[in-house]
Regions:
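Structural motif at transmembrane-helix junctions in multi-pass transporters
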Residues: 11-17, 75-91, 172-180, 230-252
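Short, small-residue-biased leader/transition segments that mark boundaries at the very start
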Residues: 2-6
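Transmembrane alpha-helices of multi-pass small-molecule transport proteins
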Residues: 14-71, 121, 181-205, 257
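Juxtamembrane helix-loop boundary signature in multi-pass membrane transporters
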Residues: 97-158, 164, 269-292
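Hydrophobic/aromatic residues within transmembrane alpha-helices
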Residues: 8-9, 18, 79, 105-111, ...
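Loop-to-transmembrane-helix transition segments
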Residues: 42-75, 144-154, 207-231
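Hydrophobic/small/kink-forming positions within alpha-helical transmembrane segments
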Residues: 1, 66, 70, 97-101, ...
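Alpha-helical transmembrane segments of compact multi-pass small-molecule transporters, enriched
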Residues: 25-29, 91-105, 120, 189-193, ...
Length: 292
């Protein structure tokens, strides 16, 4: 949630260099763990920060993870630059619903009565949210930034399902990768990908697009997102972890973004958005109850 809030501070900044710096600082956070695990394995071995050595048969899965996450990030950043955070937050809060539907199709999970209530309430709240957006001149059908945020949410859901596949043992439908391999290396792969995008796409047109200016929020975003991902991957690595529940709790970050949008950014139509947010949260609660 705090990561989303600090992203909002970069509304008038160039997206691509900001993303490049995010991946750079995130990589720098985890690079010492990789180096120590290789050169002084005794220091981190048997700790939660140890990064095992792995070959291409493992890293190819991490590269795909990097592509999915980076695509979601880019779409999300462009959308967030052009939409109120109180619109973006609840749309992102529908990710657990998409993850649950994906788990239903991909992993063969079945929805019970409470889970169906949760899904329907979340979908209904999304349509209610579109009405709140129109009060600010945002038409969900004709505003391309809405589609950016929706696609970012879809890719985020795909990423969540893929995380389940990466972390879960073979007997639970996954391949059982080490979580530190995934988080440490996918940041580094993202760094190289963003470096290429920065050089090829942004640098030649930098004078005719939104200018880049340095802000300390860029470092804070990297720290908060890295910390959130670390706890998230740790949760998924626990035996019997359910991606539908983990994803639902994670998207509780919408509370933080909504509170800051109301108190700090003074965004409009908060009463109607609050109703939509309550519907999203009630839907999440029913999903939780149905998963007990």
């Amino acid at each position: 949630g705090l990561g989303d809030v600090y992203k909002r501070q970069l509304k008038d900044n160039a997206v691509i260099p900001v993303l490049f710096l995010n991946t750079l600082f995130s990589s720098l956070i985890f690079l010492p763990f990789i180096v120590l695990s290789v050169w002084r394995p005794g220091i981190l071995e048997n700790s939660i920060f140890y990064v095992p050595v792995a070959g291409w048969e493992v890293h190819r899965y991490v590269v795909l993870k990097s592509v999915i996450v980076l695509s979601s990030w880019m779409l999300g950043y462009f959308g967030m630059k052009n939409l109120p955070i109180t619109i973006v937050g609840p749309i992102n809060a529908t990710r657990p619903v998409m993850v649950l539907v994906g788990a239903l199709v991909v992993f063969g999970e079945r929805l019970n009565f409470y889970q169906w209530i949760g899904v329907l309430m979340a979908v209904f709240s999304f349509f209610m949210l579109s009405r709140s957006g129109k009060k600010e001149g945002i038409d969900f059908k004709h505003n391309k930034w809405i589609y950016y945020v929706v696609m970012a949410a879809v890719l985020g859901a795909v990423s969540g399902l893929y995380d389940k596949y990466l972390m879960a043992p073979a007997d639970q439908g996954g391949i059982g990768l080490d979580r530190m391999i995934v988080q440490s290396w996918y940041n580094i792969y993202q760094l190289f990908m963003m470096g290429g995008i920065l050089i090829l796409l942004w640098w030649p047109k930098r004078k005719s697009t939104t200018p880049f200016h340095w802000h300390w929020c860029i470092i804070l975003i990297s720290i908060f997102l890295s910390a959130a991902d670390f706890v998230y991957f740790y949760a998924l690595s626990l035996d019997g972890a359910m991606i539908s529940i983990v994803s639902m709790v994670r998207r509780g970050s919408v509370l933080v973004s909504f509170i800051f949008g109301a108190m700090v950014f003074r965004e409009k139509n908060l009463k109607s958005k609050a109703v939509d947010l309550v519907l999203v949260l009630i839907g999440m609660i029913f999903l939780y109850l149905g998963s007990q």
